[in-house]
């Protein structure tokens, strides 16, 4: 699973992307829990539901199931 970060999210994670090979999250909600654990500065943004998630180039809802070969992009709010 590849997770891509954009804009100021890259600054918080210090990464443009990362690969999760083992024990990948099963849905967006689990991914959010993992991100909060790994990047505490993202927690308030994740809790406020201001970030957008796309799976394989399509925006998605939190209950969407994830597969090990998915590419997930995380975007901040845009005006």
Where are these regions (language model features)?
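Ubiquitin-like/PB1-type beta-grasp interaction modules and other compact soluble beta-rich domains
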Residues: 1-79
């Amino acid at each position: 699973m590849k997770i891509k970060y954009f804009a100021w999210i890259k600054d918080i994670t210090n990464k443009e992307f990362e690969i999760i090979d083992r024990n990948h999250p099963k849905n967006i909600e689990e991914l959010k829990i993992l991100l909060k654990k790994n990047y505490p500065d993202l927690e308030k943004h994740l809790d406020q539901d201001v970030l957008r998630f796309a799976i394989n180039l399509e925006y998605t809802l939190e209950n969407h199931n994830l597969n090990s070969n998915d590419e997930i992009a995380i975007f901040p709010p845009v005006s």
